[in-house]
């Protein structure tokens, strides 16, 4: 039998006051752990408003404030902490980066967002993330006491090859910290979470920030967890809150027995993910 565990998505509303944001994050992670969560997921840019004018000011260098805090929160609460993402300064470059810490506070993974959000949607959102960040270069999978997992960040979800590559490397849970917006969120957010879960017969966790007003970029919220059949297992609205979901990894094997799509891959014809 494979493990069962409870996960929590901390759908936090980011503030311009960093101390206030950190205090909220610490409190919400502690609350999640007290309620039985063993894996806690923060959203994209949890420590920083999603705006070019804040990225450099809130950036973390190696052993920076955000990284130290996440390590401490993981160890103090005995949880695996998927640290959403923070602006990471490395040399003269800035990355949109997710750090993952085990229950002892040790860093076990780092994912730098591969696909940068450069869009200009007619009548909707305009953003050019590449004006601020450099793209990551690595597919990220990591082992936990529950099993192997993968992580991607927001716009990465639109590229199914990435999730497939993680699944082929053994990931049974894919975690996606994100901040979809008011243009793409209602159209594509739940659809994308369910599609990536169904495509790869994995649990897919879409961890959004809460909606906040007064910024140029307004977040959609609606954190969502989909099961290996592509059905919504847990979801919430746009407000600041903690979303809980019980995960049974035996469901992955069950679905793959019933619909053995990986056994029917025609890699003699196509091979888009290694």
Question: Where do the language-model regions lie?
Answer:
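Active-site catalytic loop in hydrolytic enzyme cores
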Residues: 89-169, 182-191, 257-261, 271
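Short, glycine-anchored, charge-dense loop/turn motifs used at functional sites
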Residues: 7, 100-108, 226-234
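Short, acidic/polar
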Residues: 20-29, 158-164
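Short beta-strand segments enriched in small/hydrophobic residues
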Residues: 2-13
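CN hydrolase (nitrilase-like) catalytic-core segments centered on the catalytic cysteine
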Residues: 62-82, 148, 154-243
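Short beta-strand scaffold segments in enzyme catalytic cores
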Residues: 83-84, 97-100, 140-142, 223-225, ...
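Cys-nucleophile CN-hydrolase/nitrilase-fold catalytic domain and related Cys-dependent amidase chemistry
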Residues: 15-18, 27-110, 119, 180-200
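A short C-terminal boundary segment appended to hydrolase-like catalytic domains
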Residues: 250-274
